[in-house]
Amino acid sequence: MQNQIDMVKDEAEVAASISAIKGEEWGNCSSVEDQPSFQEEEAAKVPYVGDKEPLSSLAAEYQSGSPILLEKIKILDSQYIGIRRTRGDGNCFFRSFMFSYLEHILESQDRAEVDRIKVNVEKCRKTLQNLGYTDFTFEDFFALFLEQLDDILQGTEESISYDELVNRSRDQSVSDYIVMFFRFVTAGDIRTRADFFEPFITGLSNATVDQFCKSSVEPMGEESDHIHITALSDALGVAIRVVYLDRSSCDSGGVTVNHHDFVPVGITNEKDEEASAPFITLLYRPGHYDILYPKPSCKVSDNVGK
């Protein structure tokens, strides 16, 4: 019971943090009405998954902006080796998670992790069936994700290279299908644990759990927040670190970069928590997620507040 209470407190804190960030004014738009078209134009310039870039490219965006943001980017630059941008089309969280996870498996060749997540994928399939989803509505999405898992493991005729992984992630027919896989998995977990998620959903949108899943989870192009991240992390058993880039400062006036680790439910002791340390790190700016690459020798927790 205490663990559940702690989880609720953590989720409430994250929800408040994200809401505060979303309330900030960003960019150089002259009015709120200008922002949607501006964002669409900017999004179209970025592929679904971009190239890996140095953090200096992020700093260049804010040279004439907030000194606090520039200071925070300096902190990020000391902790992270690069950033990979994703298209800001409402699917950026899922695309970032997709590429970061598959990239990790391709580089690590962690067959035990592939075996583990396949078990969770099968549980997610049964969850959807038990909820009344018909197989034809989601089966193709599940099959394509499992195919990618098999193809990134080396040693078979179907094995793919790193460049091919990038190409597939930029291929709409592949990328969108995997995003839909994640959306179904997320919706299934939210519906199954409706009692847990309901307070956060009603607090954000005044919608029921069913309405929220139908309008804000399952459709392509709908943005993700802490509810989606928690559900996907728990369903697949994959920890996710989200680093927040905002204008906030410490009570003392200093500058820190806050992050939150979404640790899958069921992690109850320090040994398990250490074993499940996030290998996926995402950067959150208002309404958008990109991928961050930690420097191998850096302990992020030393200088980045949790």
Swiss-Prot record:
Q: What is this protein called?
A: OVARIAN TUMOR DOMAIN-containing deubiquitinating enzyme 1
- Catalyzed chemical reaction(s): Thiol-dependent hydrolysis of ester, thioester, amide, peptide and isopeptide bonds formed by the C-terminal Gly of ubiquitin (a 76-residue protein attached to proteins as an intracellular targeting signal)
Q: What is the protein's known function?
A: Hydrolase that can remove conjugated ubiquitin from proteins in vitro and may therefore play an important regulatory role at the level of protein turnover by preventing degradation. Cysteine protease with a preference for Met-1 and 'Lys-48' over 'Lys-63'-linked ubiquitin (UB) tetramers (e.g. Ub2, Ub3 and Ub4) as substrates.
Classification of source organism = Eukaryota, Viridiplantae, Streptophyta, Embryophyta, Tracheophyta
Keywords of the record, alphabetical order, are: Hydrolase, Protease, Thiol protease, Ubl conjugation pathway
| Enzyme Commission code(s) on record | 3.4.19.12
- From the record, give the cysteines joined by S-S bonds: none
Query: What's known about how pH impacts activity here?
Result: Optimum pH is 7.
- Organism field: Arabidopsis thaliana (Mouse-ear cress)
Instruction: Cite the Pfam families for this sequence.
Output: Peptidase_C65
Question: Keyword Cell division, does the record have it?
Answer: no
Q: Which stretches make up the OTU domain?
A: 81-295
Known outcome of mutating residue 89 to E:
Abolished cleavage activities for 'Lys-48'- and 'Lys-63'-linked ubiquitin (UB) tetramers and of linear UB polymer
Q: Which family does it belong to?
A: Belongs to the peptidase C65 family.
**What modulates its activity?**
Cleavage activities for 'Lys-48'- and 'Lys-63'-linked ubiquitin (UB) tetramers is inhibited by UB aldehyde and N-ethylmaleimide but not by the metalloprotease inhibitors 1,10-phenanthroline and EDTA, and the serine protease inhibitor phenylmethylsulfonyl fluoride.
Q: Does the keyword Coiled coil apply?
A: no
